[in-house]
Amino acid sequence: MNPLAQPIIYLTVFTGTLITALSSHWFFAWLGLEMNMLAFIPVLTKKTSPRSTEAAIKYFLTQATASMIFLMAILHNNMFSGQWTTANTTNPYSSLMIVTALAMKLGMAPFHFWVPEVTQGVPLTSGLLLLTWQKLAPISIMYQMYPSVDTNILLTLSILSILVGSWGGLNQTQLHKILAYSSITHMGWMVAVLPYNPNITILNLIIYITLTTTTFLILDLNSSTTILLLSRTWNKLTWLMPLISSTLLSLGGLPPLTGFLPKWAIIEEFAKNDNLIAPTIMAIISLLNLYFYARLIYITSITLLPMSNNVKMKWQFENTKPAPLLPTLTILTALLLPISPLILSIP
């Protein structure tokens, strides 16, 4: 990517998301999504390679299809209601098409097919933006229009996403794909609680972004893209071992770490609304998600690969990349659960 064009591209990505998030008019919401999508394609291909080009094409085709469905849905809604406001979506078919388009943009099942492949084909920094920042605009639209959507549709999408995300990550050796399937699972949890308490969805999104950012920073610091490379961390950056373990367990939702907080709040909200079957299914399926993170920790922290090299450890000579945000983010990924009553009491 041209260094001169890089600030303009990132500014356009930021502006597109901001327009969509702050808009109450369907046309401007669509316009922001388009700006964001077109500006994000150069971000995916900033390190030119056949794999990143393929990933960018897959991303463009999927997002363009979702945008066409979204535009058709808002025109259909305007034709029947005469309204352009996002909070006034009275036609059920329009609502269904909008949710379908947003689910495709979020990478929720059964429209998840592009997320692992695109994440695998791009650099770590681009993958981080894809799995965090690019979720903000679709979630903001869904947040505004959730009263117009059938709860059963959202629950079906959510449970299916949790199932696909948890099951799909079991057989992976590439860390990019594992984090992509984890993203699908987290999207399912966020959308599931949206009809009951949208504020918990926002809390879940903030915690998810914090955990995912911490994980990507650790992987970038360690230059790890596969489980095999991650297993050599003890020889490269010994001090990073406890950080990897706590972050991955928190991302899997193990108590008493921060990642358990949104799941706890969501299950409690379902119980308040006398819905016990859905959270039970979601919690049981999420154990698969926790399992493949526990497997990563076992390979990384507990097993010790045989080494025939008797020289000094590599970490004694290697210069560590600067990561000023990592200590703060690591604390947030592990220690927010004790103050959960304070967090949940915020209106």
Swiss-Prot record:
InterPro entries: Complex_I_Subunit_2, NADH_DH_su2_C, NADH_UbQ_OxRdtase_chain2, ND/Mrp_TM
Residues annotated as transmembrane: 13-33, 55-75, 96-116, 122-142, 151-171, 178-198, 199-219, 237-257, 277-297, 326-346
Catalytic activity: a ubiquinone + NADH + 5 H(+)(in) = a ubiquinol + NAD(+) + 4 H(+)(out)
Membrane topology designation: Multi-pass membrane protein
Record EC number: 7.1.1.2
GO BP terms in the entry: mitochondrial electron transport, NADH to ubiquinone
UniProt GO molecular function: NADH dehydrogenase (ubiquinone) activity
Keywords (A to Z) from UniProt: Electron transport, Membrane, Mitochondrion, Mitochondrion inner membrane, NAD, Respiratory chain, Translocase, Transmembrane, Transmembrane helix, Transport, Ubiquinone
GO CC, one annotated term: mitochondrial inner membrane
Subcellular location: Mitochondrion inner membrane
Summary of subunit composition and partner proteins: Core subunit of respiratory chain NADH dehydrogenase (Complex I) which is composed of 45 different subunits. Interacts with TMEM242.
PANTHER family noted in UniProt: NADH-UBIQUINONE OXIDOREDUCTASE CHAIN 2 (PTHR46552:SF1)
Family: Belongs to the complex I subunit 2 family.
Function: Core subunit of the mitochondrial membrane respiratory chain NADH dehydrogenase (Complex I) which catalyzes electron transfer from NADH through the respiratory chain, using ubiquinone as an electron acceptor. Essential for the catalytic activity and assembly of complex I.
Protein name per Swiss-Prot or TrEMBL: NADH-ubiquinone oxidoreductase chain 2
Organism lineage: Eukaryota, Metazoa, Chordata, Craniata, Vertebrata
